[in-house]
UniProtKB/Swiss-Prot annotation:
Transmembrane segments: none annotated. Its EC number is 3.1.21.2. This is Probable endonuclease 4. Its cofactor is Zn(2+). The gene is nfo. The lineage of its organism: Bacteria, Pseudomonadati, Chlorobiota, Chlorobiia, Chlorobiales. Disulfide bonds: none annotated. Zn(2+) 2 binds at residues 145, 179, 216, 261. It comes from Chlorobium chlorochromatii (strain CaD3). Endonuclease IV plays a role in DNA repair. It cleaves phosphodiester bonds at apurinic or apyrimidinic (AP) sites, generating a 3'-hydroxyl group and a 5'-terminal sugar phosphate.
Amino acid sequence: MKRVGAHVSASGGVEQAPLNATAIGAKAFALFTKNQRQWKAPKLSKATIEAFQKACADGGFQPQHILPHDSYLINLGSPDPEKLERARSAFIDEMQRVADLGLQLLNFHPGSHLKEISEEASLLLIAESINMALEATNGVTAVIENTAGQGTNLGYRFEQIAFLIDRIEDKSRVGVCLDTCHLFASGYDLSSTEAIETTFNEFDSTVGLHYLRGMHLNDAMQPLGSRVDRHASLGKGTIGMAAFTFIMNHPACEEIPLILETPNPDIWSEEIALLYSLQQVD
């Protein structure tokens, strides 16, 4: 089964997220387990954890269909030793929160070199950061998200993601989330069935489709290779619908969270229904 959902609000407590997902007809969801603009948050209470798990069970959401995202403040490739230490500590805390909720995945943007060190030096710091977090926690997979390559963000080429995975000690606990807008912005064409098939094949040969743990389904505001991270509603941007039809019929996308981060939450239920309508019956 394809598991389509959206990055829903957890305002009022994480237990609200599965309720918000159910309300839009989602079969998966993403959330922040804390305020994504803050470094610290109180530990999740037993009551909150139990309420979250009950809401997930009631909505039919399994842990592998839920894709928590870490704080935007965290830069695991920071050239500043003090900031790097803070980022690593915060990332471990995010992983522990995911584990406390009984979940299995933590989606994150790799990091940025900030023009102060080389791309490779920053990638080595990111790999080291991931290894440290996996060592300090149990049961949670680090899910690397490809980026649009905006500014000095790394992870915009499949080769960079492969570089990171090659250096992860426990490869059973590393995966990838592919964002369609980011792919297109970073130069991977998705604008036709042939184009996205070529991109998927390149990902498979460079990284491996067996590492795919989730996707973010977003159209793009800017043209191919723009390196600008601006999401558009499905069919309203520069990617077009062929890519989403391909994804909704690709076996590698079975039973993983396929998450909308499109700009209009009011039409998420319609976009979810649209995606399911693209499935071809055998």
